């Protein structure tokens, strides 16, 4: 399950990744308890908003550079109107914000939820208008994070999450 690290010839150790102590049981619980889409989305919303808030205080150059790179990928995919590239970059965008939050538990939980939700989405984006909306929402969030406006980034992320539920027909 990732909570114990077995090293042949050396012994058995408790994993150094403390985030696994939360994430692995969460993954199994969600998997075993069937369809909990609404509950998962509520937790995702809370984590995404908090991650955006914390990301505004990010001082990790590597994480900030990744966020920049992903924002550039989103821009390129938008210009090309390449839906697949855009959706892949969308997942990376949210992941990089979680990384910028500096909270490994938030990051790990959002990765787990993202993997679960990838299989739950009933429709994806269906038109260029939605692509533009998401692009503009991401640009706003990214700009507020760069401006070190945690409150603004959190509000923009909250609005983005609300709109995403409608776009992806989550119920």
What do these predicted ranges mean?
Residues 65, 129-132:
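Short helix-capping and inter-helix turn/linker motifs at the boundaries of alpha-helical repeat units
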Residues 1-47, 53:
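Short linear motifs at protein or domain termini
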Residues 81, 126-129:
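Structural signature of alpha-solenoid helical repeat scaffolds
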Residues 162-171:
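Short arginine-rich
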Residues 40-122, 136-144, 152-163:
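Conserved amphipathic alpha-helical segments that form helical-bundle/coiled-coil interaction surfaces
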